Amino acid sequence: MDTKIEIMRENPLFLSNFTPKYAKMNATTTYHTPVLLSESVDLLAIDPDGTYVDLTFGGGGHSRYILSKLSERGRLYSFDQDPDAKANCPDDPRFHFVESNFRFLRGALRYRGVEQVDGILADLGVSSHHFDCTERGFSFRGEAPLDMRMYYRNGRSAADIVNEADAETLTRIFGEWGEIDTPYKAANCIVRARATAPILTTAQLVEAVAPCTPRKDESKFLTKLFQALRIEVNGEMEALKMALEQSLKMLRP
């Protein structure tokens, strides 16, 4: 199964044709150090000869720690759909990098001859690396294309959603994924702003929702707004549900 969705648009209004500089960056130094590293990995009760999966490779912190506990017969399969993560892969014959969204867990491992595994780890959320790479559009600080895709050719960008979705859909996104108190206000602000000009950058989005942004909690409000869009763009909740269902079928008793 081809796990890369190649959806390209010709309309210059949207950003699906945008190929960012970050695709060729070496991002090793900008990933955060995993929190509770030993505590989380130790809960896997590593069998040195076992087969393990890291669903969120990122900077490779968890994967390297798991590798340190494996024997020569042990195996680790680490997933990440972000091309930047490939720069962090260890040179280790026990390590296998899977450039894919973890929603394809079972199919990707079966393709590699793996039917069952001894443990699966996921460090969910977004890495500090994504905020540090301002050109990716994950942060509301500064000016950047409104993209937010973990894989830069993977379906719709945040700009596509902001400019295409109706007020009802935007309200659902901001309420469900961002838990914003008044999501309909943010949705209406966006609909009004884009009627004048398309919203293509992070700064333009911040400006569009300025009329409904609480001054005392501006940072918190924008954090929730951007989080909601990121989750929608990348289908994070659907991917997690699929991965959990597949994990139950792949874990050894």
Task: Enumerate the language-model features and the residues they cover.
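S-adenosyl-L-methionine-dependent methyltransferase catalytic core, i.e., the SAM/SAH-binding region
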Residues: 6, 14, 18-253
